[in-house]
Amino acid sequence: MKKTALSAWHEAAGAKMIDFGGFLMPVQYTGIIAEHKAVREAAGLFDVSHMGNFYVRGARALEFLQYMTTNDLAKIVDGQAQYTLMLYPDGGIVDDLIIYRVSADTFFLIVNASNCEKDFDWLSSHIGQFEGVALENHTSELSLIALQGPKSFDILARVFPGAGIDKLGSFHFIKLPFEGAEIMVARTGYTGEAGVEICLPNERAVALWSALMEAGKSDGIQPIGLGARDTLRLEMGYSLYGHEIERDVNPLEARLKWVVKLNKPNFIGKQACEQVEINPRKSVVGFSLEGRAIPRQHFKVYNSDKQEIGEVCSGTVSPTLQEPIGTASLLLDYAQPGTPIFVEIRGTMQPGAVRRLPFVHADRP
C-alpha cells in the first residue's frame, strides 16, 4: 500500500488509517463530527495527496483536452482552473477532474485517486491523434494539501504574508515560493467553505503542513480525515466518483449538465449527451429522512405507492443538520423538492422527502 509524504505525521497524531484508492490514508483523528464542525466553524487541514496529477504539454494541448473533456477549456485563461468531466463514447463518466491552465501550452490535471491509472491510460490512448502533445504523470512526486474553513485566509496570511491569497478569485491559482520550492495555491475545495488546495513537492509537504497547523492553532485548526471530507461534500451535494457519478451514469442525469458544453466542437461522449438531453429519464437529487436510520449506497427508494423509483447514491447523518441526508438517483417524475419518498433500510420503509441541494450554504453563489 502506498503512503503519502504526511503518513508518519498522521500516525503520530493518532489517526485511524485505512486503505483508500491504494493509499494508507487518515479516515479520522478526534472523530468525524468534531472534525466536520471544525471546518464549518474554523479551519481544517486535509492531506489529499492520494489524488492523481498529470501535466499535459504541447502546442496542441488545448485542442487535445477540448476533445477529451466536456467543459469549454477555451473559456479560461492562465492562472485559472475549471471543473470538468471525461466521458466514454456512450456518455458514461470516466472521471471528474479539475484542469489548471498554467500557460497556453501547459495544463495541470488533478484526478481521483481510484481512477488515476485508468485516467492516464484513457488520455494516453487518444493522445496519438494530437502530434506533439505530451502527457506526464507526477502523482508520485507531488503532495496535495487542502486548507478549508472560514479562518483559512487568516491562517494563510500568517504563513504567506503579503501574498494576497485572500484576493484570489474562485477557481484561480497562483504560484508562490516556499522553502526554496515553487508551490501552487488554488482557490478550490470540496467542502463548500472558503479555502485553498496547495500542490507542492513531497519534500516540502511536512514543513508546510506543520507551518499551517502552527499558524492556525489560535483559530482552532484541526487535521481532518476522509470521513469528515465525505460528510462535508455530501452536505454540499458535491459528486463523488463511484457514488453520484460512475461508468454507467450520464452527466445530464447527475446534475452536471452545467459542465457539459454541447455547443463546443466535438468531444468524446457528445452525441450520447445530446440524446439524453432530448429525453432524460432520471436525476440525482438530495433527500432527507425522518427518524435516525442512515441511508447507504444502493438502498432502494420507493414512492408513496411503494413502487421502486431509484436508489441511494450516498448517505450519512448530517453533522450540521443532525438528520439523515443523502443523494439518490430517481426517476424524473419524483425529482422535485418536497416529493415524498421512502427508503428501505433493513426491511423497514423509512419516510422522507426530496430536498433542494445543497443542504447547507444554500445562500452562496
Swiss-Prot record:
Coiled coil: none annotated. Its EC number is 2.1.2.10. It catalyses: N(6)-[(R)-S(8)-aminomethyldihydrolipoyl]-L-lysyl-[protein] + (6S)-5,6,7,8-tetrahydrofolate = N(6)-[(R)-dihydrolipoyl]-L-lysyl-[protein] + (6R)-5,10-methylene-5,6,7,8-tetrahydrofolate + NH4(+). The keyword Transferase applies. Keywords: Aminotransferase, Transferase. One of its GO terms (biological process) is glycine decarboxylation via glycine cleavage system. Pfam families: GCV_T (PF01571), GCV_T_C (PF08669). The glycine cleavage system is composed of four proteins: P, T, L and H. The glycine cleavage system catalyzes the degradation of glycine. Belongs to the GcvT family. NCBIfam families: gcvT (TIGR00528), PRK00389.1 (NF001567). This is Aminomethyltransferase. It comes from Chlorobaculum tepidum (strain ATCC 49652 / DSM 12025 / NBRC 103806 / TLS) (Chlorobium tepidum). The gene is gcvT.
